[in-house]
Amino acid sequence: MTTKRNAIIATALLMGLTGAGSAWAHGNVVPQAVETKGLTPIKDTNLPLDADGWAAQNPYRNSPERDKAVEIGASAYNQNCAACHGLEAKSGGIAPDLRMLDAAEAGDEWFVERVRHGAVRDGRVYMPKMADYLSQEALWAVRTYLDSVHVEE
């Protein structure tokens, strides 16, 4: 009887530890490469760039490449963002619902800040510095996709 009881306790403990590992895994997603063929490189746009070569606003929002950017952005989002922010940008509560991000240029500044610098609180990474892993073209494609699924609060 004691052996059976110990086995049950050990199983419950193991299951609890497995679940705890999943809870702490937020933010530990390995970024996946994004193919941006079909999008004009940022440096070739006529937008003003900052000292680091970053555009302050989305170069694809009103361009003929918008639909291609949405397509690439949707794929990039699913590969790199959905694990935390939810499928179709519908958050399950772990991270912000990105459909609510200010649409158009109003949200570009916040977007650039987050993807370039991430978010760290109390030494814990809540949002990785995605600009360390993905090209600016890929990240602006994600932003274009997010604009396409935007909803008002």
Give residue ranges: language-model regions.
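Short alpha-helical segments used as structural interaction elements across diverse proteins
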Residues: M1-T3, V70, A74, W140
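Post-cleavage N-terminal segment of exported redox proteins
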Residues: T2-I8, A12-K68, Y145-E153
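Extracytoplasmic electron-transfer domains, predominantly the class I c-type cytochrome c fold
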Residues: G27-A33, R99-V151
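Sequence/structural segment immediately N-terminal to covalent heme-attachment motifs in c-type
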Residues: D50-A55, R66-E88, W110-H117
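Short amphipathic alpha-helical interaction/hinge segments
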Residues: A89-G92, G123
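Short cysteine/histidine-rich zinc-coordinating motifs and their immediately flanking basic loops
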Residues: G93-L98
